[in-house]
């Protein structure tokens, strides 16, 4: 009730009422998405009321508690807003709230013949066979988080980023949105890898795009699985529909591959079409990623209607006004992905 009342008041410019309701909701410490969402929009209400110190305190609380969450990312953007200049975030690392578990294999896992086989295969340079063997053992010993992380690294080494990402999400999901101490050095690289780099780099350069933006879309569309297929027939890393392949393929030099599934799922082909599509959508939406992501999930026509409806308001208003919950989640994830990729790789070679 407080959430609906707070957002309704914000939408009708009843800012004091919005702040009161959202503050009350935060004080109740709701579970799930409500706490970061309420903190974010409370900060907006305070900012619009001109209460700069209260807005900064609220956004800082949000970014400290949920630095990798969608609303935490948005909160950091708000702290950098010129209207909050002089009170912005200092860029320091968020306070640790969680402690990453000790990654120690159980005795039963150490003694398992499958682990010994995986070790021998890895030493022989058979990385995919080693990863498959570790994966099979993990299905039997899913409680062993040391084995889970070892399996994720083995899969990534073998180039199977789809399964590596799945293992990290399934076994260490609580660390993807909340700050934690003593994370393994390569933890975030497993969560946000850069597979098929030459293909993505070439596609990005051909379309004047940031390759990290393409990875943000790819991660949400296919989880890095080049053979991914949706229920409606979208294929590959960027989930390209045959009609899209027919329309864009010839213009990017890959020809009309709409009737050739094996060609469509080829990473270089799929990336070329996906990047061209993303570039066209970015032009259509004046460089804003949120409506581009909405177009990928719900179609260009609906995204255009929703974007027009917010009439020049900031992206955060657009995202939370999307009426389809699936599309809303999809867009939030793409934006969070992009912020995370930039955090990890902005200063590195594409």
What is each of the regions a protein language model found here?
Residues 107-136:
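Alpha-helical segment of the N-proximal tetratricopeptide repeat
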Residues 1-3, 8, 12-23, 27-40, ...:
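Catalytic glycan-binding domains that act on GlcNAc-containing polysaccharides
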